[in-house]
A protein has these predicted regions:
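Mid-to-C-terminal alpha-helical segments outside catalytic/metal-binding sites
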Residues: 1-19, 30-88, 95, 279-282, ...
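Catalytic pocket-lining loop regions of alpha/beta-barrel enzymes
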Residues: 4-8, 158-162, 170-285, 293, ...
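A generic "structured core" feature
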Residues: 19-23, 126, 217
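Divalent metal-coordination and catalytic microenvironments
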Residues: 22, 88, 96, 119, ...
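Histidine-centered divalent metal-coordination motifs
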Residues: 22-30, 195, 230
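Short, flexible/disordered intra-domain loops and linkers
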Residues: 35, 72-73, 105-113, 201-208, ...
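Alpha-helical scaffolding within the catalytic cores
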Residues: 78-84, 114-121, 146-150, 210-214, ...
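Active-site gating/metal-coordination segments in enzymes
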Residues: 94-208
Length: 348
């Protein structure tokens, strides 16, 4: 931590227990096996443009999306989970909900970038730091029989409590063909995280992940616990309205925190309205980490230094974001949802 503070003077140690709700182990070592797919190269281009728009750490840079990408992110020969722990300790993050990168639409549905099994092995190395968040999709191509079997196995035999649904590679959030998945998740008492808002990177389809579609799901499965990633941006208002009257809908700030520097007013409006409609106890923090360690730095500093502008408090009635609220968003809200003990810090 001392080395981190020296390199980044604005970064100082704090006492917030932090859990990253969205941390991808994206199979960096595997990408050389499928980077020839044109759809993968479109994804790389989209990722770079998203990083530029958010003012986050750029990962891939290429002048022509058809060309093989070059990587400017921090290089490491370490296993992804080992490098992740270095980042967690460097930036004072206690735990991370790790999820595999499916992205089968980028490989012609021939392979996933990383798998649930790989993440289970990674978590065995750091059981007090890593929480496995399996991705059971794509639901439609797999079929419900296999999806439900794996859901039961991972929940009951491997104690997984958080499951990711990535609509852009699959189908609409409210596709009734996947109702059996929601029903079984509700029965098991597990939480479902869902990518909401925009797809961000081709060839994923944005129409599949519109927050308004959640309304059908939570009306039919009122007790199902859902974490909506990315605050539903740019359809934040629709997500806030869904959360307003459905007490088991949580809003994740993953991806958007770098706007504390690049677009502070926009971020303040997103956070202020989410708290106003869902309540501070249903807002959770995350990075949307996919490789660059700087994403942790930006997400930590972004929330830690955040203050609700007085003008927005006056114009919209937004509440001040107190230290207690930040503590909940950083970790204790998600800890209560997943049954995590926060009495002792885990970041070294």
């Amino acid at each position: 931590m001392a080395e981190t503070a020296k390199k980044y003077p604005e970064f100082q140690k704090d006492d917030y227990f932090k859990i990253d709700v969205e941390c991808h182990l994206s199979g960096e070592a595997n990408k050389k096996y499928f980077n020839y797919y044109p759809e993968y190269r479109k994804w790389v281009y989209g990722t770079a443009e998203t990083a530029r728009a958010f003012g986050a750490v750029p990962h891939h840079v290429t002048k022509n999306w058809k060309e093989p990408p070059t990587t400017k992110a921090e290089k490491s020969e370490m296993a992804e989970e080992d490098q992740l722990i270095v980042y967690l300790d460097r930036y004072g993050v206690d735990m991370a909900c790790i999820l595999p990168e499916s992205m089968m639409e980028t490989t012609g549905y021939s392979t996933k970038w990383s798998t649930n099994g790989q993440l289970l092995l990674a978590a065995e190395k750091y059981p007090d730091r890593l929480i496995v968040q399996p991705n059971l999709g794509p639901f439609i191509k797999r079929g419900m029989k296999d999806v439900l079997w794996e859901l039961d196995y991972l929940a009951q035999e491997r104690n997984c409590k958080l499951f990711k649904f990535y609509p852009p590679e699959d189908t609409y959030i409210n596709d009734e063909r996947i109702w059996p998945f929601y029903k079984r998740a509700e029965e098991l008492g597990v939480t479902v995280s869902i990518h909401t808002g925009w797809s961000w990177c081709p060839p994923g389809k944005a129409k599949y992940c519109q927050p308004l579609l959640l309304d059908d799901v939570v009306n039919d499965f009122y007790d199902l616990k859902i974490v909506a990633f990315h605050a539903g941006w740019p359809q934040c208002k629709e997500l806030n309205m869904v959360a307003l009257s459905h007490p088991n809908v949580y809003i994740s700030l993953s991806l958007i925190m770098p706007w504390y520097k690049a677009a502070p007013k926009r971020l303040a409006e997103i956070i202020g309205e989410a708290i106003q409609f869902a309540g501070p106890e249903r807002i959770v923090w995350g990075t949307d980490f996919y490789g660059p360690g700087g994403l942790f730095r930006e997400a930590v500093i972004g929330l830690r230094t955040f203050e609700m502008p007085e003008q927005l408090q006056k114009d919209y009635g937004f509440a001040p974001v107190t230290d207690e609220i930040k503590r909940g968003i950083f970790g204790t809200n998600l800890a209560k949802l997943l049954g995590v003990d926060t009495s002792k810090r885990r970041a070294k």
